[in-house]
Amino acid sequence: CIRDRMNIGMVGMHGCYTSNRAVADCDVLIAVGARFSDRVALNPKTFAKNATIIQIDIDASELGKNVDVDLAIVGDAAYVLNAMLPMIEDKKHPDWMKMIHEWQAQDYHPVSDASRLMPHQVIGEVCNQCGPEAVYVTDVGQHQMWAAQYIRHTKSRGFITSGGLGTMGFGYGAAIGAQMALGRDQRVVMFTGDGSFHMNLNEACTAVSYELPIITVIFNNQVLGMVRQWQTAFYGKRFSQTDPHRKTNFVKLAEGFGLKGYHCENLAQFQEAF
């Protein structure tokens, strides 16, 4: 997320407590380029039920498609928002912001385990080492949700992800594109999972051929984690094609491409490797 006091994070099933409470309790919700997918509006009938919903989208077919809205505006986001700004009075809403800060204090804080490597620890360590000016890229899956939750960046277009498009394998190509466009002096980090990485690992050859210093962090749980999560939550644990089975040795794979590879199982090992 962009470092800004008004940014309170993602909404929906992969979002955080604070942002979901804010959406549930707000009186006006302005959605810009948001389609209200099933990951965001799990129950369209109760989503933001107390709010007047204003939806802005350049694609008219998206307006009111998944959630009933009170005002639908077709248009380019930049044009519409610039047209709206003169109509809005500057208000501070101190009570509302105080309530949001109280929710943030109650928000979920992951427990650290020295014997295991936790996703938030990995992302936190990478961000501490690479800084807010790095470009962070994700593939698709649970690692993508962790990254969206915990990366803090200040660089414009510093977080590159395909959002809800589900484009597994997107990450490596996007990281290569960012590195080529910004030059070798720009730090580029790609977060991926074992499932997504398998989709496009051949691009490691491209990265090596062009001597691109991309850092690739693979969250390896040997399974399509997000698919299995949905099968657990919504399909009575009727698992299909999501049993842990992958035994890929990513260290040897990296070395086969001429890259350096490290296998880490706890934070100390990760810090040493990084």
Predicted regions mapped to residue ranges:
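Active-site diphosphate/adenylate-binding microenvironment
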Residues: 3, 101-183
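Glycine-rich, acidic loop regions that bind phosphate or pyrophosphate groups
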Residues: 5-99
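Thiamine diphosphate
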Residues: 7, 14, 20, 25, ...
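Structural signal for hydrophobic packing residues in well-ordered secondary-structure cores
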Residues: 27, 33-36, 81-92, 104-108, ...
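Receiver (REC) domain switch-region micro-motif
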Residues: 29, 136, 188
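Short beta-strand segments
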Residues: 31-33, 57, 139, 191-192, ...
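Flexible, glycine/proline-enriched loop segments at strand-loop-helix junctions
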Residues: 71-72, 109-114, 262
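Short, basic/glycine-rich phosphate-binding loops at helix/coil junctions
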Residues: 96-105, 252-254
